[in-house]
Amino acid sequence: MATTTAEPVTTHPFDPGTKPDLRNPVFQAFIVLRAAFTVAPILFGLDKFAHVLVNWDIYFAPRLDRIVPGTAHQAMYAVGAIEIVAGLVVALRPKYGSLLVAAWLVGIIVNLLLIPGYYDVALRDFGLFLAAVALFRLASAFDRRPLLRR
């Protein structure tokens, strides 16, 4: 009876389950998305206080302004604080931060759909939502730390 030698099992060099490696294009995509969803929310959040890029108050739906206490300007301070926190969570725990950013983007999209003339911005934010979901999927492979350690 002939004996066969089994070939060693190797993983594909771009398997997301492998150790993080900067030569791995899947890991590179994770790094790019993580950096983008760390920096952008923090910068946009800070700008809610400074108004350097734009007057953010115009992006707050008048319907919501009637419901939320205070003015649109005051609401944007809260929005800015939430965005800064979201960016920091992505930096520290991308698996959970990406879900926070995705949920936040859904809220932004709904808000923009309530303002006539901002549908193009809502569509762009939908693209960002999809990228945040992609970051969550990649973080599931590369950020395997549990939320709470025992």
Feature map (PLM): residue ranges:
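Membrane-interface extramembranous regions
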Residues: 2-150
